[in-house]
């Protein structure tokens, strides 16, 4: 019975790939509408619930974000659009100076 099964070959160790380091002068990515909402409301949630953990704060913020109507989300969406335009213009300038 042992003769019919092949002996296991030792596996070759996987090579670790190293990530390329980010350029510290590269422009920061634009924030999403949710991130603008979370940054604005995080302290409010913490003051209302002083005993919750970091993860629970995020969960509460997520629930509040889902409960917002499209009209209530609009100010955050417009901030996200403006930040996206800022990022794109900074990225174009950055790429032009790199090339």
From Swiss-Prot:
<dbReference type="GO" id="GO:0006281">
    <property type="term" value="P:DNA repair"/>
</dbReference>
<dbReference type="GO" id="GO:0001195">
    <property type="term" value="P:maintenance of transcriptional fidelity during transcription elongation by RNA polymerase III"/>
</dbReference>
<dbReference type="GO" id="GO:0006338">
    <property type="term" value="P:chromatin remodeling"/>
</dbReference>
<comment type="similarity">
    <text>Belongs to the NHP6 family.</text>
</comment>
<comment type="function">
    <text>DNA-binding protein that induces severe bending of DNA. Required for DNA-binding by the FACT complex, a general chromatin factor that acts to reorganize nucleosomes. The FACT complex is involved in multiple processes that require DNA as a template such as mRNA elongation, DNA replication and DNA repair. Also augments the fidelity of transcription by RNA polymerase III independently of any role in the FACT complex. Required for transcriptional initiation fidelity of some but not all tRNA genes. Seems to be functionally redundant with NHP6A.</text>
</comment>
<keyword id="KW-0227">DNA damage</keyword>
<dbReference type="GO" id="GO:0043565">
    <property type="term" value="F:sequence-specific DNA binding"/>
</dbReference>
<dbReference type="GO" id="GO:0006366">
    <property type="term" value="P:transcription by RNA polymerase II"/>
</dbReference>
<keyword id="KW-0238">DNA-binding</keyword>
<feature type="region of interest" description="Disordered">
    <location>
        <begin position="69"/>
        <end position="99"/>
    </location>
</feature>
<dbReference type="InterPro" id="IPR009071">
    <property type="entry name" value="HMG_box_dom"/>
</dbReference>
<keyword id="KW-0805">Transcription regulation</keyword>
<feature type="compositionally biased region" description="Basic and acidic residues">
    <location>
        <begin position="69"/>
        <end position="93"/>
    </location>
</feature>
<dbReference type="InterPro" id="IPR050342">
    <property type="entry name" value="HMGB"/>
</dbReference>
<dbReference type="Pfam" id="PF00505">
    <property type="entry name" value="HMG_box"/>
</dbReference>
<keyword id="KW-0158">Chromosome</keyword>
<comment type="subunit">
    <text>Weakly associates with the stable SPT16-POB3 heterodimer to form the FACT (yFACT or SNP) complex, which is associated with nucleosomes. Multiple molecules of NHP6 (NHP6A and/or NHP6B) are required to recruit the SPT16-POB3 heterodimer to DNA.</text>
</comment>
<protein>
    <recommendedName>
        <fullName>Non-histone chromosomal protein 6B</fullName>
    </recommendedName>
</protein>
<feature type="DNA-binding region" description="HMG box">
    <location>
        <begin position="27"/>
        <end position="95"/>
    </location>
</feature>
<feature type="compositionally biased region" description="Basic residues">
    <location>
        <begin position="13"/>
        <end position="22"/>
    </location>
</feature>
<dbReference type="InterPro" id="IPR036910">
    <property type="entry name" value="HMG_box_dom_sf"/>
</dbReference>
<dbReference type="GO" id="GO:0008301">
    <property type="term" value="F:DNA binding, bending"/>
</dbReference>
<dbReference type="GO" id="GO:0005694">
    <property type="term" value="C:chromosome"/>
</dbReference>
<keyword id="KW-0804">Transcription</keyword>
<feature type="region of interest" description="Disordered">
    <location>
        <begin position="1"/>
        <end position="31"/>
    </location>
</feature>
<keyword id="KW-0539">Nucleus</keyword>
<keyword id="KW-0234">DNA repair</keyword>
<dbReference type="GO" id="GO:0070898">
    <property type="term" value="P:RNA polymerase III preinitiation complex assembly"/>
</dbReference>
<feature type="compositionally biased region" description="Basic and acidic residues">
    <location>
        <begin position="1"/>
        <end position="12"/>
    </location>
</feature>
<dbReference type="GO" id="GO:0005634">
    <property type="term" value="C:nucleus"/>
</dbReference>
